[in-house]
Amino acid sequence: MISLFYIFATSLTKMQLLNILNHRLYLMHSIHRRVIMPVPTLKHFINGQYIESKGSEYFDLVSPVTGESYARSPNATVADVDDAYASAKEAFKIWGRSTPSARQQALLALADTVEKNAERLIESQSRNTGQLKHLIASEEIATSVDHIRFFAGAARFLEGKATAEYLSDMTSSIRREPLGVVGQVTPWNYPLMMAVWKIAPALAAGNTVVLKPSDTTPESTLLLAELSAPFFPAGTFNVVLGNASAGSLVVSHKTPAMVSITGSVRAGLQVASSAAANLTRAHLELGGKAPVVIFADADVDKAVEIIVTAGYFNAGQDCTAASRVLVHESVYDIFVTKLVAAAKATRFGDPEDKEALYGPLNNVRQLEQVTGFLARLPAHARIETGGRQADRSGYYFEPTVITGLEQEDEMIQTEIFGPVITVQKFLTEQDAIEKANDVKYGLASSVWTRDHGRALRLSRELDFGTVWINTHIPLTAEAPHGGFKNSGYGKDLSAYGFDEYTRIKHVMSSND
């Protein structure tokens, strides 16, 4: 039997046939390459270089945009973590004795290098998180560079009690010293910026670091460590990869003088317990459930505009997100109408979408958590808009507004970490204060009013580490960030954040 391809081929010119055959060979080669091309495997960054894991356990990194795996990451072993801490301990002998000006110069060089390598960092982080590239550039790269430069300056500004003779013939002075080696764990919502919040004050104070990034978003942190290598002694900044078991190895190790985590309340409790077993200092920045209190005299249009941005930015995956709105009954209806309209107009999209406000949720576990909250919604609650996974590939969730919830309901009391905003009524100022404070969290809050006295009263009464007035979510390197209650303790950013990574020593000398 004569094949159809033979009949087709005989009707073509020699050149046409050659082009077709070449194209078929190209396609076969491309398919073959796709099949056999190995998936990239990440390595730890220890002692100034990439190091293969000593273990055999690996897991897939999965794109939040497509749901497909694209790389493999090792799960750090005891030996890996021991090596990282040994390197950090050795590096501290050099870095811990460096001058403040030397630390400043190293950090300034790192900031410049991060700025120059912005595109590489954006690509690596977007691949891990699905975040919008234009917002990584404006909200993480630029901010991280600024924060590194701030702590470079802080390295040279050490404060303490004045040297004096507080006892007769005795002179007392105060030394502010680095702690030593610090163990750190960072989350997946802002991988680069959270790593900078940890390492910049630690390095500025003269400490060395072993850091474990989130298991789903390690690449921008690895690249940050690589970029830092030329400016610091080998072993100053080490990165070990892995899941919660690797994090447990980092925070329970006997070497660090302090352990620091940004993460969930559950993770923070585990870290605090591990640290307590070794009497290790702990620094915890944990979850939040920020109340947004809207009084009758507030600028409702401005409030809606900012709440939508602060509530849905990064798909609501922010501990300070404007997720729990309390509105005076007199403006409740108009506020809800405008908020729902703004939510419906909010655009989400893939990393290249420059018009979108947010991308997908970071991982399938987080998607299941958010959908689980909606599945358990009580009958008296109402979904005004959204409330479901978007009809597309990846872990996208629609912008959601929910009303009718009662104070004791799960969605009022528990951090959702998704693009979900709840709205409640309040009757009086005292009612607003009581409802705002009636959660286990204490990280951030905001008050919306034109009454200056009321704003000051609320800033005093609200039991949260940050109180914004007529805005929500901006942060600056010069001001502290940290919470109360189950949101943890210790401060990031500012001179207070720098002090977290130092210790105070009293030196008294006889004048005889």
What residue ranges belong to the model's regions?
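Hydrophobic face of amphipathic alpha-helices that form TPR/SEL1-like repeat modules
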Residues: 20-21, 26-65
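Conserved C-terminal structural/oligomerization subdomain of aldehyde/semialdehyde dehydrogenase
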Residues: 66-72, 256, 293, 347, ...
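Residue-level signal for inorganic ion chemistry
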Residues: 67, 103, 125, 148, ...
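Glycine-rich loop-to-alpha-helix module at the N-terminal edge of alpha/beta enzyme cores
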Residues: 68-158
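Short, well-ordered beta-strand elements within core beta-sheets of diverse protein domains
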Residues: 70-76, 91-97, 184, 292-295, ...
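Rossmann-like NAD(P) dinucleotide-binding subdomain of oxidoreductase/dehydrogenase enzymes
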Residues: 160-302, 426
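ALDH superfamily catalytic-core signature
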Residues: 266-406, 430, 469
